[in-house]
Amino acid sequence: MIPLNTTDYANALGLKAKQASALMARAPTATKNAALRKLAGLLRANVNALQIDNARDIERAVQSGLAAPMVDRLKLSPQVIETCAQGCEQLAGMADVIGEIIGMKQQPSGIRVGQMRVPIGVFGMIFESRPNVTIEAASLSIKSGNACILRGGSEAIESNKALARLVQQALTESGLPAEAVQLVQTTDRAVVGQLITMPQYVDVIIPRGGKGLIERISRDAKVPVIKHLDGNCHTYVDDPCDIAMAVKVADNAKTNKYSPCNATESLLVARAVAAEFLPSIGRVYAAKGVEMRCDPQALAIFKENQPVAPVNIGHDAIDSAVELKPVLVLAQESDWFEEYLAPIISIKVVAGVDEAIAHINRYSSHHTDAILTRDHMHAQQFLREVDSASVMVNTSTRFADGFEYGLGAEIGISTDKFHARGPVGIEGLTSLKYVVLGDGEIRA
């Protein structure tokens, strides 16, 4: 039973994690991989049971009026569970970087100096909504030889508990300490306040959720923080570009799924191709119910090539109400900063690549931004000058994902520049220590 005293409870979690981290740091690669494969098998064997627990969370979320994108993030479908299992297996098949020595060089004194990759120790993960994060965090923690304390959102408590039980079962059956992965079993937010102020136990905190959560954690934490901020991702359609390819990619980047942080929220279009590109993508978005918040230039092109029947929705609608269909509205300044997580996209016509880069660097959350172009020099300029964790050429921002990057899983997508940036996989949960080898040398 959880103690009423949240300080005692958090300290108990921290002490157990610290003790387990010492065992995990020296765990053999084969043992860690066995635990990951065991976990993959347990996930597949328990799909029905997991969905029963998940259904309780979803029912409670719907009854409480949780927004539809947040409810969508809660769902543990068979496909989501299978992806988690595959992520565990992919991690098990990857090389173990723990103990790897890099950059070994002989110095004039005779000593050899290099760096060894080692686990961070204990990380705390504070996240909202997505229960699959429990598996992603746990599997990466196991592979990287760390211990972790996970605190999911109250809206996913039953799903997270069920998943954490499977993780601990896999650890125990593989000969590793169950305490290497601990889930906070209470929804009391006071525990979060304790976790982020325990440098004696916790080496780093990784918050993954809304802007309010991350700002509070960053402000109050007494341990280092790796931030997973919002994803105001941009796709820029350049001149020249393959229009058909650009329509296909811009469609996927926005409508493949609305709730992930790697969905495109703003579409920038070079003026020279706007008259050809915008009507085509407009018809696609209109058919899928995507609201388009446009700057005056884009709006004028759409009005000349009307892809939708505009309606008045109280957001500076451009015309009187006709019928409930996808809408064109005049974008406001705040729209350029917005992560919608919904069938809404901001659209702006720009002079060219220079203006696109300037716009992205001003309004982007520095998560993921893409250029669609046939100009190699423009592509290289975009890659150099856009200040984001992931920059892409001729592909969908939806690929900004640890699994798609071959990391096996991700703990989050860091928009920081310090320590880890972009999808945080195994190496992001390690640090480097110096290794010095000698043969009796002494300093003069």
Swiss-Prot record:
Q: Per UniProt, what is one GO molecular function of this protein?
A: glutamate-5-semialdehyde dehydrogenase activity
Q: Which reaction does it catalyse?
A: L-glutamate 5-semialdehyde + phosphate + NADP(+) = L-glutamyl 5-phosphate + NADPH + H(+)
Domain of life, per UniProt, equals Bacteria
- Top-level class of the enzyme under EC nomenclature: oxidoreductase
Alphabetical keyword list = Amino-acid biosynthesis, Cytoplasm, NADP, Oxidoreductase, Proline biosynthesis
Q: Name one GO biological process term.
A: L-proline biosynthetic process
Q: Which Gene3D superfamilies match?
A: Aldehyde Dehydrogenase, Chain A, domain 1 (3.40.605.10), Aldehyde Dehydrogenase, Chain A, domain 2 (3.40.309.10)
Q: What is its EC number?
A: 1.2.1.41
State where the protein is found: Cytoplasm
Q: Where is this protein primarily located?
A: cytoplasm
- Identify the metabolic or biological route this protein is part of: Amino-acid biosynthesis; L-proline biosynthesis; L-glutamate 5-semialdehyde from L-glutamate: step 2/2
The record's listing under InterPro entries reads: Ald_DH/histidinol_DH (IPR016161), Ald_DH_C (IPR016163), Ald_DH_N (IPR016162), Aldehyde_DH_dom (IPR015590), G-glutamylP_reductase_CS (IPR020593), Glu-5-SA_DH (IPR012134), GPR_dom (IPR000965)
HAMAP family (UniProt xref): ProA
Reported function: Catalyzes the NADPH-dependent reduction of L-glutamate 5-phosphate into L-glutamate 5-semialdehyde and phosphate. The product spontaneously undergoes cyclization to form 1-pyrroline-5-carboxylate.
Q: What is this protein called?
A: Gamma-glutamyl phosphate reductase
What is the organism field in this record? Albidiferax ferrireducens (strain ATCC BAA-621 / DSM 15236 / T118) (Rhodoferax ferrireducens)
